[in-house]
């Protein structure tokens, strides 16, 4: 049964993720060849370090098996706060630190929360392939600014000033 009639036009207009397409192709090729390297998902080519595995097992044994606060566990947020102060001399309040399951989720949440129909979101190009769908699903219009090898992948102030309009709602800067 095809349930696509139940999906919104916005969802139906989305393209299949190029990242997931390439990952599936790499998995397929790995069944036929030994020397396939997948550069699609950014998965590390090494196993999770033993001390992290042990910590995860201990966390399960200690009962960390329930939903966490939406912003993340306070002890983790405090550790992040300490790290930024110690390593980067940056000070953030607890209300400025959120732990999520990844950048894609956070960026999607932000766009859904602040982007209105027709709002513009400036994105530096090259960019991650999901950004256009994330912005579009929120009703926004993505405005890419190209920063390629000739510019050492750095956007200029002039480029940014030219891209900003009265409809600009956000500048997406994620590395």
Q: What is each model feature region?
A:
Residues 143, 149-175:
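Active-site phosphate-binding strand-loop segment of PLP-dependent enzymes
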Residues 113-135:
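Conserved PLP-anchoring active-site segment centered on the Schiff-base-forming lysine
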Residues 35, 120, 141:
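Residue-level detector of anion-binding/catalytic polar loops
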Residues 2-102, 109:
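N-terminal small-domain helix-loop-helix segment of the aminotransferase-like
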